[in-house]
Amino acid sequence: MTDNPWLIMMINMTIVFGVLIVLGILMVLIHAVDPTKKVQGKKKPVVAKPAPSAAASKRQEEEKVAAMAAVLALVQDEDDMIAAALSAAIAEHKRKMEPMNLPHHSF
């Protein structure tokens, strides 16, 4: 039996890397003989769609811009509504908490 830590390390690392190599080879063999692998058929070529006309493209762009403007207006209105509801909730909370006369702590 040896007490040399370098020799023990080399033996351990040889065993570890040997096991890893064997597992890697086993994985390659399993992938090569995999019975559950689906058979890939020939892929059909993708047919390119014709380009839309300039008028249709312009109309689609206008519709997109209008939709974006509507969404932005809606979001702005929602933000205002949320801010108003939050302000009302804070005011209601303050109104309910004032009569309790809780001690104020200063840290």
From Swiss-Prot:
It catalyses: (2E)-glutaconyl-CoA + Na(+)(in) + H(+) = (2E)-butenoyl-CoA + Na(+)(out) + CO2. InterPro entries: Na_pump_deCOase (IPR005899). It holds the Pfam family OAD_gamma. Residues 37-60 are annotated as: Disordered. The keyword Magnesium does not apply. One of its GO terms (biological process) is glutamate catabolic process via 2-hydroxyglutarate. One of its GO terms (molecular function) is sodium ion transmembrane transporter activity. It is an enzyme of class 7 (translocase). It is a single-pass membrane protein. Residues 47-57 have a biased composition (Low complexity). Pathway: Amino-acid degradation; L-glutamate degradation via hydroxyglutarate pathway; crotonoyl-CoA from L-glutamate: step 5/5. The chain crosses the membrane at residues 10-32. It is found in: Cell membrane. Its EC number is 7.2.4.5. Keywords: Cell membrane, Decarboxylase, Ion transport, Lyase, Membrane, Sodium, Sodium transport, Translocase, Transmembrane, Transmembrane helix, Transport. GO terms for cellular component: plasma membrane. Belongs to the OadG family. Part of the primary sodium pump glutaconyl-CoA decarboxylase (GCD). Possible membrane anchor for the alpha subunit. Heterooctamer consisting of two alpha, two beta, two gamma and two delta subunits. This is Glutaconyl-CoA decarboxylase subunit delta. It comes from Acidaminococcus fermentans (strain ATCC 25085 / DSM 20731 / CCUG 9996 / CIP 106432 / VR4). The gene is gcdD.
